[in-house]
Amino acid sequence: MDYDKLKGVIEGLLFISGDEGIDAKEISEITEVTEEEVIDLIEDMKADFRRAGRGIQIVEVAKAYQLTTLPEHVPYFERLATSPGQSTLSQAALETLAIVAYKQPLTRSEIEEIRGVKCEKALNTLLSKQLIREAGRAEGIGRPILYATTKEFLEHFGLRELGDLPEPPVNLDIEEARLEASALFGKAEEATND
């Protein structure tokens, strides 16, 4: 694989690894180049990002590399987070919210087991919009956080109580459930945006 393609692959790996990051050893195993070459490539990418005036940077935290935004751009990100146009929820957030609404209280790992993918970003979005809350800690190893819906969730979706949620289908078809969640929560989003 040529040098530029390797840098592109590494950038993609950094992107999909998210907040957890990825260490040079794992990148080395995936790309089949030495750890030293990976470190050299990352240093070169850091310089490329600076030269090009990119809005992201590569940082090393606890021996793992991450893509992060530049600290000097924080005021713009704050504006985005508080702008009215950002009131809609992503499909991932809607799915996560539906799971919490029907199965609460439950842990992040239980949600991820149901969805089949990570849900940290969706949970953070829902927490920041105050649609879910931390509802204590589960018993067991590590005492993970339990999540439940909030009063704001009920208000946002025009529900008097959780019992007003439609009954989930017995034989759940995941694609059909996604469409129903979008329809239910999408209508409530439209009503609150009017």
Swiss-Prot record:
Coiled coil feature spans: none
Entry's Gene Ontology BP terms: cell division; chromosome separation; DNA replication
Keyword Cell division: yes
Record has Cell cycle as a keyword: yes
TM region(s), chain numbering: none
Pfam families: SMC_ScpB
InterPro entries for this protein: ScpB_csome_segregation (IPR005234), WH-like_DNA-bd_sf (IPR036388), WH_DNA-bd_sf (IPR036390)
Signal sequence coordinates: none
Gene3D superfamilies per the UniProt record, alphabetical: Winged helix-like DNA-binding domain superfamily/Winged helix DNA-binding domain
Keywords for this protein: Cell cycle, Cell division, Chromosome partition, Cytoplasm
One of the record's GO cellular component terms: cytoplasm
Cellular localization per UniProt: Cytoplasm
Function: Participates in chromosomal partition during cell division. May act via the formation of a condensin-like complex containing Smc and ScpA that pull DNA away from mid-cell into both cell halves.
Stated family: Belongs to the ScpB family.
Quaternary context: Homodimer. Homodimerization may be required to stabilize the binding of ScpA to the Smc head domains. Component of a cohesin-like complex composed of ScpA, ScpB and the Smc homodimer, in which ScpA and ScpB bind to the head domain of Smc. The presence of the three proteins is required for the association of the complex with DNA.
Protein name stated in the entry: Segregation and condensation protein B
Organism this protein belongs to: Brevibacillus brevis (strain 47 / JCM 6285 / NBRC 100599)
Primary gene name: scpB
